[in-house]
Structures are given as C-alpha cells and as structure tokens.
C-alpha cells in the first residue's frame, strides 16, 4: 500500500485537524520549532516505531479535556482480498471499510489523549438497523440477525457470508462516514491482515551517526529476504523433496549392497 496523506489532530502543537498530503518525495521546510519533527513523530507513533512512543503529555495543551488525540494515515493500493479464516475471503470494499474516496483511512485514536491508542477505520459504513456495527459481532449474534430477517445462507459458520447476506437483504444501508473500531472480532482479524501490507517506516535521525547495523537499515533488508523466500517457497520445497529422494536412494542402495556382502 502507498501512504497518501497524514492527518494529525490534537497532537502536540497541532490543535484541531491538520492534513498533510504526501507525494513520492515530500520535504518539510520551516523554521525551528514550527512542528516538522512532530510530523515525523506522528508517523512513528502510527507505525509503532520504537523511537516514537506516545505520552499523555503529547496531547495538545490547547485542546479540551474530552478531546481525543488522532493520528490518521490514508492509503491507496489496498489489497484485493483478505483472508478472514481458513474458508472465508473478503475485501475492504465488501466490508465497507473504505472512505468516500475509495481509500483506506486508518486512525490511531487516543481517547481523551490517554492509553495506548486503538486503530479505527474512518469509512463509508452502514448505519441502517441490523447492518450497523455487524463487523464487530460474533457468529451467534450474526446468526440471530439472519434468522430475524429470514435469511438462509450456505454456511452459517462463516461470518463473512452472514454479513454479506445481511447487507444484501437490507438493501438500503444508509452509508455514512464514521469511525469503525478494528479492535475485536473480524475487525481485529482484518487489522492483522492489513498490517502485513503497511509500508515500512524508517526514521533516520540527522543528529546521530547511522550504520548498516541499525534496524532502520536491517529491517527492510530482512523483510525483502522473507518476501523473496516466500515467493520461491514452492521451488524450495521441490528441491527439498528431490534431495531427500536422492539421499534415500543412495542409502537404500548402500544397505542393499551391504546385505549382499
């Protein structure tokens, strides 16, 4: 996925909502203490960088006590399919988790500026009765809704199939922009899948020396190696089988000759 926009709200010096559009190359230019480092730290907090830890003191001092701190990222190039369980696949579009522009907009929200932050999708999501919030419902709850609406499905064990059947039956879903938590049930599973597609965030600090032993350098290389190995996993398994067959053939032949002797 590609990062298209950063959204900061009530984080340090950024009171209210601030949007920063990101191109292939983006430079932040400004005088000292204008908030350039805050932008990079906000990205670090969202992506969970070890050098960027959120603290309650990071909440904007001009915000209200009940105001939330939000750090959002908007992505294009979302995955075509997501695997929910061994038998079910879905898409972000089918789950109504994309915003009005058809992009994936994720926010790490710190309620009242406290806590570890929870991931929410800001999306055009159903608000109609029986269709609202069903991404976060358990299988038994989905089956109860399906029974109430007299819906028959081929596999009642699949939350994906149940949700899509409910959406189709309701018809008018009353889509409205809203925050949907990705902290539990299939929402959590979808977030776990999304994380494998997130861009890698590396932070190089100019005030300290950088070496090829640092995680900013090694982590992308390790990820590239893992991806390459995954792509040729089938070939490697075939090689492993052939090596095993050859070794067993030699061993069997040797034992046969020893028995003859």
Language-model features and meaning:
Residues 40-102:
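Conserved P-loop NTP-binding catalytic core
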Residues 55-59, 91-93, 175-194:
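Short alpha-helical segments and helix-capping/turn motifs at coil-helix boundaries
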Residues 100, 104-112, 124-148:
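Extended, regular secondary-structure scaffolds
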Residues 24, 73-77, 205-208:
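Flexible glycine-/small-residue-rich
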Residues 26, 75-79, 110-114:
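Beta-strand elements of well-folded, non-transmembrane domains
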Residues 73-87, 153-185:
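Extended, Lys/Arg-enriched charged tracts that mediate electrostatic binding to polyanionic substrates
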Residues 179-187, 194-261:
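Extended helical coiled-coil dimerization/tether regions that scaffold
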Residues 1-48, 56-66:
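Pre-Walker A-like glycine/lysine-rich segment at the N-terminus of P-loop NTPase domains
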